[in-house]
């Protein structure tokens, strides 16, 4: 993506082990590109901060929220506020905002899917307000998946993650 001229690249999987170094290697090689990633636990944030500081880079990190998928992310609440504060305070990383993956919202009825999405986004907005009330920066919100892309695309208060429209996951034809 860096070679292709992308200016903003989000690695939407939490890097661990040697992948931390690989990400920072790309960020160092393509200094004109804003590389960022997600994190959902203090160990990962610490590893990212330590490696970024050693590389002389400040890496934007999105707090990965579990909004119902149950696969990645930290549930909105006090533990997530504490983790966001850690991202904000450690040298080497900075808060990029909130990341959410809503792949569990794939009802075949668009009205049902929209209602569930709106409820989920209300929770995200409430959590964001909690962070801001604690004087923690929330520069942005990024989220989405293939089935909810049309909903995210209609809102300018956050960025869309387009899902798998190029690869088209099995079964999405019916959703």
Indicate residue ranges for each PLM-predicted region.
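Active-site-proximal beta-alpha core segment in soluble small-molecule metabolic enzymes
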Residues: 2-110
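Active-site loop/helix belt of alpha/beta enzymes
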Residues: 60, 66-174
